[in-house]
Amino acid sequence: FFDVENAPKVIGGRYGLGSKDVTPTDIKTVFDNLTSENPKNNFTLGIVDDVTNTSLEKSEPIKIAQPGTVRCKFWGLGSDGTVGANKQAIKIIGDNTNKYAQAYFAYDSKKSGGITMSHLRFGDAPIRSTYLIDEADYIACHNQSYVNQYDLLKGLKDGGIFVLNTIWNEAELDQYLPAKMKKFIAENNINFYTVNATKIAQEIGLGSRI
């Protein structure tokens, strides 16, 4: 388009850097950039570039909830059986019900003993969300040590369900759960459940697989 009269302005950017996911909010951010007075060219999505400042400032988060679709996130530990169980669960739903089903799995660099994330969606309508879950109906954490390491409840919707695998009793929960987590549970009407799945697994001969 060089030297062409009334040439269009071409704006480009990159996404997926560092294996970062691209969400509907990111897409909206791109369009907000394009319609701004001085759109940024050669931008990056998903990362915070504090060196060359190519990243776009995120727009107001948008939530695209598909009616009738259940969205679940599971925090697990590598080789604890969480990923395998979720693969079986989503296969059973897809093969034996009339529901549509989708699953994504994310891992860290460790093959065993590292963090795992399972993202499951199932519902009555076709699922077209090609990104990890950013708003969940149900979140489960299968390793109690994560409560002080990660923002486990980020994205859990108001009135959602949180299940924690833990050996702590009620008094210990009050002692060990971070204040930020307790505040979120109270303010967002979260249904909070605990289960000692580790003990149950040992008693029935499953070992470390919960």
Language model regions located:
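Active-site cofactor/cluster-binding pocket
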Residues: 1-2, 19, 68-78, 83-210
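Peripheral docking tails and interdomain loops at the edges
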Residues: 1-65, 191-210
